[in-house]
């Protein structure tokens, strides 16, 4: 088995034109991942052709995403984030509960794409705003019309040092 490793430039995440377009919002909605992962793994072991096809498409999609980041193509990056969201929903019907859909409906016109990182169903909502003005509008909407007391924006930044493990 041959593994490939790609270096991905940070331009789409750090350049002033794009930096403020990446938004992370804690939805205040929770869901445990254990049951979700168990269902997906079960479908894989049962050779569910639908699930296996989705997983194969996700693999190709990850390579498309890497190529898009290497080309510094912001609009395609946002569209591919949206495609990721559609794939996640096809893999697990519990990915987008009504409370999450309500949040998305408020902001989707201002985004190129969005998704719930991780297992879905709640947690964080990552959004790629169309431009910095759209990002400001998203912040206004979700700050003025908070879906629950736990929901809030979370600052995020690309790490300059990468993943580090320390031992205490």
Regions found by a protein language model. Name each.
Residues 1-115, 126-168:
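C-terminal nucleotide
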Residues 118-123:
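Short Gly/Ser/Thr- and Asp/Glu-enriched loop/turn motifs at secondary-structure junctions
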């Amino acid at each position: 088995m041959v593994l490939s490793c790609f270096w991905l430039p940070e331009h789409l995440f750090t350049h002033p034109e794009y930096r403020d377009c990446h938004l992370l919002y804690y939805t205040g909605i929770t869901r445990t991942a254990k049951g979700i992962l168990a269902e997906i793994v079960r479908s894989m072991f049962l050779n569910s052709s639908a699930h296996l096809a989705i997983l194969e498409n996700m693999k190709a999609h990850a390579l498309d995403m890497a190529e898009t980041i290497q080309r510094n193509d912001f609009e395609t990056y946002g569209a591919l984030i949206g495609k990721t969201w559609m794939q996640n929903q096809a893999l697990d019907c519990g990915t987008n509960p009504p409370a999450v859909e309500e949040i998305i409906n408020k902001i989707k016109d201002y985004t190129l794409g969005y998704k719930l990182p991780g297992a879905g169903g709640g947690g964080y909502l990552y959004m790629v705003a169309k431009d910095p003005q759209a990002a400001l509008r998203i912040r206004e909407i979700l700050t003025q019309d908070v879906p629950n007391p736990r929901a809030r924006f979370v600052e995020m930044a690309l790490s300059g040092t990468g993943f580090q493990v320390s031992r205490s």
